[in-house]
A protein has these predicted regions:
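GIY-YIG nuclease catalytic motif and its immediate N-terminal context
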Residues: 1-39, 48-53, 61-70
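Short, glycine- and small/hydrophobic-rich beta-strand elements in well-ordered beta-sheets
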Residues: 41-43
Length: 70
């Protein structure tokens, strides 16, 4: 079984808004946001500052935390 962490993260956008997301590759996902290939919400709102990240053992647990935060 592959040992893979899932992350909930919060980005601060340049317009002082926040974006919360879930990923299993935090560096790759933030790079996607920076390059305009992340979520529709973050397109044109970079650069971003990573304010928070927390690892979870499963995607399900990470998604539950994302919902709780939002």
């Amino acid at each position: 079984m592959k040992n893979e962490s899932w992350f909930v993260y919060i980005l601060l956008c340049k317009d002082s808004t926040f974006y919360t997301g879930v990923t299993n590759d935090i560096k790759k996902r933030i790079l996607a946001h920076e390059n305009g290939k992340g979520a529709k919400y973050t397109k044109g709102r970079g650069p971003f500052k990573l304010l928070y990240k927390r690892a979870f053992e499963t995607q399900s647990l990470a998604l539950k935390e994302e919902i709780r935060i939002k």
